[in-house]
Swiss-Prot record:
Catalysed transformations (reactions): 2-deoxy-alpha-D-ribose 1-phosphate = 2-deoxy-D-ribose 5-phosphate; alpha-D-ribose 1-phosphate = D-ribose 5-phosphate
Entry keyword Manganese: yes
Key words, A-Z: Cytoplasm, Isomerase, Manganese, Metal-binding
Intracellular or extracellular location(s): Cytoplasm
Cofactor(s) the protein needs: Mn(2+)
Gene: deoB1
One Pfam family it belongs to: Metalloenzyme
Leading EC class: isomerase
Entry-linked SUPFAM superfamilies: Alkaline phosphatase-like, DeoB insert domain-like
Binding, Mn(2+) 1: 13, 339-340
Name under which the protein is recorded: Phosphopentomutase
InterPro entries per record: Alkaline_phosphatase_core_sf (IPR017850), DeoB (IPR010045), Metalloenzyme (IPR006124), Phosphopentomutase_DeoB_cap_sf (IPR024052)
Family: Belongs to the phosphopentomutase family.
């Protein structure tokens, strides 16, 4: 019999809690990540008030220096620790795949200076359309169509851009480049980015409509992803007939592998929390696992190096945490974590190699305290242990510590 009927894992995308031991092996604009500290620097520079996460034990997590404005609790309501990444990468897919039990020894490729000319020319030759070179770099998806949509409407050129993650995105006005054509181009782009030196996690079709100054992305987005190279704990649960619910971009990250209920993309963190609470309230969700990603911390504030916005986003999540807790059933377990860091005070605009926090809460807890410092995959090992399925490649369960 499972210790918990349901486990809800919430990833606060990029909310790291201090440089990992190997952080200096990773760089931002030529600066090693060794001094990065997402939560620590936000707390120190702009202040951070997250009383609900603090109550569970966020301020109790061991650090060289305590979080300046997040006090430790004498009697926390749950358990806390920090986890280290093993895999050779600091991107979203690597972090999530490791959380679900895989060790990624060959990281995906990211393109901070845009895609190489040979990829661009291959897409041009295949599609018969030119590519707007000025857009070929990491770009906000809304800003890139604001900046280059008018030109695309005049010339029919493709808008190809990337982000901090290993993705190639193609934006196309639906009245200029029909959806079927866009999808066909994306399928081709997928076929030429399956191995080094351009091993990408996803190709994303980003259709939009409207007029200059009033463009809107449509629901016709399509992701061309790769599935994990081995079974994750999601697959183990699915194979055992256990419900797995994905909220936000989780389904995309795993290419649907091991997920039997996709609850859709999030329009915002708040929308994602609404969807999570709705999922938790489903009468048919009696036993199983929900997996939620809240991406605004990373996409809107981390990459843009906006500590004030990042802080406010954390405050907004913390204010809604009691709603999530209220939706829990007596034998539910809530796990709150991250997938990498993205220190908004740091050099560059890339993710940062950090420990991730882990907070655990259940209405059934009779104890509290610290869990030993472990690794990302310990989360999936704990989920597997609880539901009686095999673990994936790596991970050690801490289920026995949750009493």
């Amino acid at each position: 019999m499972s210790q918990f009927d349901r486990i809800h894992l919430v990833v606060l995308d990029s909310v790291g809690i201090g440089a990992a031991p190997d952080a200096n092996d990773f760089v931002n604009a030529g600066v090693p990540d060794g001094a990065s500290d997402t939560l620590g620097h936000i707390s120190k520079t702009v202040g951070l008030a997250v009383p609900n996460m603090a109550k569970i034990g966020l301020g109790n997590i061991p650090r060289p220096q305590a979080l300046k404005t997040v006090p430790a609790e004498e009697n926390p309501s749950g358990y806390a620790t920090k986890l280290q990444e093993v895999s050779l990468g600091k991107d979203t897919m690597t972090g999530h795949w490791e959380i679900m039990g895989l060790n990624i020894t060959e990281p995906f490729d990211t393109f901070w200076n845009g895609f190489p000319e040979d990829i661009i020319t291959k897409i041009e030759d295949f599609s018969g359309r030119k590519v707007i070179r000025e857009a070929n770099k990491p770009y906000s998806g809304t800003a890139v169509i604001d900046d280059f949509g008018p030109r695309q409407m005049e010339t029919g050129e493709l808008i190809i851009y990337t982000s901090a993650d290993p993705v190639l995105q193609i934006a196309a006005h639906e009245d200029i480049i029909p959806l079927e054509e866009l999808y066909r181009i994306c399928e081709y782009a997928r076929s030429i980015t399956m191995e080094r030196p351009a091993l990408l996690g996803r190709i994303i079709a980003r259709p939009y409509v409207g007029e200059p100054g009033n463009f809107t992305r449509t629901a016709n987005r399509h992701d061309y992803a790769v599935s994990p190279f081995e079974d994750t704990v999601l697959n183990k649960l699915d194979q055992a007939g256990i419900d797995t619910y994905a909220v936000g971009k989780i389904n995309d990250i795993f290419n649907g592998s091991g997920i039997n209920h996709d609850m859709g993309h999030n329009k915002s963190n708040s929308h994602g929390i609404d969807t999570l609470i709705k999922t938790m309230g489903l009468s048919e969700f009696e036993k199983g696992f929900s997996f939620t990603n809240l991406v605004d911390f990373d996409a809107l504030y981390g990459h843009r190096r906006d500590p004030h916005g990042y802080r406010d986003c954390l405050h907004e999540f913390d204010e809604r945490l009691p709603e999530i807790i209220s939706a829990m059933r007596d034998k539910d377990l809530l796990l709150i974590t991250a997938d990498h860091g993205n220190d908004p005070t740091y050099a560059g605009t890339d993710h940062t190699r950090e420990y991730i926090p882990l907070l655990a809460y259940s209405p059934s807890f009779t104890g509290n305290g610290l869990i030993p410092v472990g690794h990302f995959a310990d989360i999936s090992a704990t989920v597997a242990d609880n539901f009686g399925v095999d673990t994936a490649m790596i991970g050690e369960s801490f289920l026995q510590d949750l009493v």
